[in-house]
Amino acid sequence: MNLKSRTSLPILLGIVLMAIVGWSPVSRHNKSRVNKYLYVVVPGIRDYLEYGGHGILVYDITDNYKLVKRIPTGGLKENGTPSNVKGVAVSLSTNSIYITTLEALQRIDLATEKIVWEKKYEGGCDRLSISPDGKTIYLPTLEKEHWNVVNAETGEVIKQIFTNSGAHNTLYGPDGTQVYLAGLRTPTLGVSDTRTHEMIKQVGPFSSAVRPFTINGSQTLCYVNVNGLLGFEIGDLKTGAKLHHVEVAGFQQGPVKRHGCPSHGIGLTPDEKEVWLCDAFNQRMHIFDNTVMPPKQLASIELRDQPGWITFSLNGKHAYPSTGEIVDIKTRKIITTLKDEKGNPVMSEKVVEIHMSGTMAVKVGDQFGIGRVSKVK
């Protein structure tokens, strides 16, 4: 065999081998590909099935929010009809999505898309939050006296925190050391130490009972909705002081369909440059410049229904009002709307972004529109 033949033989064998087993680099690339999805839990507007039915609607963020599938869920009332969804959160450590309804907390495995367990808790359930390490859940009762601290793996109660405040909205800080607890019957925002699960501070008082709220990434400021205000207030999470009172200019208050307050929903864009505020009566999102204090009103976006919640994509490009529009943050234009299998409009106050590599969640957003700048400028 001459030199040319000896050189060609390995190449020929390689070509034959690739033809038999396939081109492996493509297979490895497909296995490691990360897909970005928006998980929309319904019924996420009270128990209204006309806004998407019952279950989890999964949308492909990179494919113009195309509906990919519907995942069945539990959360039924005693009469067998779907109960109001109250909150949603995700744990990377358990690879599970957690959903609260009026009566129960359910854990659904993201790989199998099956319910691992569903448990009822004394006093019901409201908007939960999961620790950054995915191991601990702060679970409010349904506007009752206490929060349950729950093991995310088993659903067992670790401790109860009594505040007598009408437990409602709950948010873990990004660094995992503190949880922020808002009750419907108090004008202050409570702070719990996650090492001891004890209340250590109250922020405020604000001008009325605290409704939805958000925080910045460095956990120094909170932005709160309060009853009776078309606008928001700002508090100092370190000192506990109320700092600013901001009202929407150019719009009047009026009757609202849900929640009983003019502004129910507030969020910071991930870069913390803007505050986005819900205005139910006027069916608007109002945008404020957060690079100055107090924030300055910039623009308003008209929506198809009354908004009651707002959060954002992890990359800071899109806003997700509960009315189901997808809004480009930079241009402030609506780029698409969420629809179900039949083309009907989908709306929900309980949505979360999940990045999946195969059947494993590798990165998650939050149902709250929280700031994601971790250091004070």
Regions found by a protein language model. Give the residues of each.
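Bacterial N-terminal signal peptides that target proteins for export
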Residues: N2-L12
